[in-house]
Amino acid sequence: DAQEXKRVLGQLHGGPFSASAKYFGQAHGGXEK
């Protein structure tokens, strides 16, 4: 699942910082929140 992969990547690179996870998710997931 694309969302799950984005979420995992966001966690790996952003850790507990939702801002980093969100940014990483946007970079790889396009316009989705």
Swiss-Prot record:
It comes from the Eukaryota. Suppresses expansion of husk leaf blades. This is Suppressor protein HFN40.
